[in-house]
Amino acid sequence: MTIFKYELKQLRGSIIVWSAALAASIFFMLPVYIEMLSGAAKMSSNFAGNSFFDVIGTNVDILSTPIGAYSFLTIFVLIAGAINGMKLGLGIITKEYMNKTTDFLFTKPHSRSKIFVSKLTAAVSAVIIIGAFYFLASWAGMQNGSDGNYNFLTFALLALSVTLIQMFFLTLGMLVGVIFPHIRTTVAVSAGVAFVSYVFGAFSRKMGNVIIGYFSAYIYFDGAYIIVNNSYKVEYMILLASLMLIFTITAHQIFCKKDVMVAS
């Protein structure tokens, strides 16, 4: 518990900044985009064959609805969430090596397993807090922009996807962190991984290649599919949970066995 509290306290600044940034952005932008895109369906003929919609996985008819506008904005929030999740996972591991505190931490009366679990729990708590603020701000924005004219389940699934994608990249970040503990530029690495993953997803949609889509977590939260079916795609959720479990177990095993190395 001591390690958990310490790690969560260390993440306090990040939690405040990300919660405020995501919540404020979606709250103020959503009503504007709902109004702006409400007439998009009337101009559908002008956008026929536009490859942009294929790349982002939506269409004009969906965009013209309040929930469609929210889905469109969620695409960009997912990218931000992926960067934050990856950065959290990387940072919570690599900071011990960068700050040369590994020898001190690992010689305290705590097992490595407890240290890892405490770090993971603190990072997951941070993601949940950020996700909760985003959810509430999204709900307030939807109420303000659509006058309550939307399906709450669909909205909840779209909003929850921001938390889930952060969880996915958090576990991936921790795995990368235990393998390459001396990474200094965590933000750059996180942004790069998030962007490459998005490119895989965009390429998958454009080419209609399902296999490539499995390499992009963004595909797992396809807004158009969620809006039409009011659910996530089952196989993607199974894959997501499986990968997160594999990343976590592998990272835990490496962390517990890795030699203590102090950064020079």
Language-model features: locations:
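Transmembrane helix boundary and interhelical loop/hinge segments in multi-pass membrane proteins
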Residues: 86-106, 120
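Hydrophobic/aromatic residues in alpha-helical transmembrane segments
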Residues: 85-89, 137, 171-172, 217, ...
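Long, hydrophobic alpha-helical segments
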Residues: 68-94, 191
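Secretory targeting signals
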Residues: 23, 27-31, 67-73, 117-169, ...
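Transmembrane helix-loop junction
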Residues: 6, 95, 139-143, 177-178, ...
